[in-house]
From Swiss-Prot:
The lineage of its organism: Eukaryota, Fungi, Dikarya, Ascomycota, Saccharomycotina. Residues 40-82 are annotated as: Disordered. InterPro entries: SAGA_su_Sgf11 (IPR013246). Gene3D superfamilies: Classic Zinc Finger. Functions as a component of the transcription regulatory histone acetylation (HAT) complex SAGA. At the promoters, SAGA is required for recruitment of the basal transcription machinery. It influences RNA polymerase II transcriptional activity through different activities such as TBP interaction and promoter selectivity, interaction with transcription activators, and chromatin modification through histone acetylation and deubiquitination. SAGA acetylates nucleosomal histone H3 to some extent (to form H3K9ac, H3K14ac, H3K18ac and H3K23ac). It is found in: Nucleus. Belongs to the SGF11 family. It comes from Candida albicans (strain SC5314 / ATCC MYA-2876). GO terms for cellular component: DUBm complex; SAGA complex. The long N-terminal helix forms part of the 'assembly lobe' of the SAGA deubiquitination module. The C-terminal SGF11-type zinc-finger domain together with the C-terminal catalytic domain of UBP8 forms the 'catalytic lobe' of the SAGA deubiquitination module. This is SAGA-associated factor 11.
Length: 120
């Protein structure tokens, strides 16, 4: 088995490739989640507008949206933010320095303290 010597260049290339792969995976998962959320939101708004045909059009420049639709969009934005917060706190990551599982919302503060103390 032939192994290549570890140099700064190979180490930097390896770290860079790992970072790029993780960023691509995270972006892909986020995009897929957003697409699923938006499609379910569209399905629910379509069913609401079909059931409520007597909606009044708000006088907001004549863009054709009802006040119910505007409220629904605002509510969905608030719900999306709360979903993101719940996902952030319910997802755990393993600290490579000390080996503990840390909640996503606390990971940045943990890793800075953990690296300061050099726990292992």
């Amino acid at each position: 088995m032939t192994s290549t010597p570890i140099t700064y260049k190979t180490l930097a290339d390896s770290i860079f490739n790992d970072l790029i792969n993780n960023i691509i995976k995270q972006h892909t998962l986020t995009s897929l989640t957003n697409i699923k959320d938006h499609s379910s939101l569209l399905n629910s708004s379509n069913s609401n507008t079909n059931s409520n045909t007597n909606g009044t059009i708000a006088s907001n420049g004549g863009n054709g949206t009802t006040s119910d639709e505007n409220n629904e969009i605002e509510n969905s934005t608030i719900q999306d933010k709360s979903k993101l917060k719940q996902l952030e706190t319910s997802r755990y990551f393993r600290c490579l320095n000390c080996g503990r599982n840390i909640a996503g919302g606390r990971f940045a503060s943990h890793i800075s303290k953990c690296l300061e103390r050099k726990r292992k």
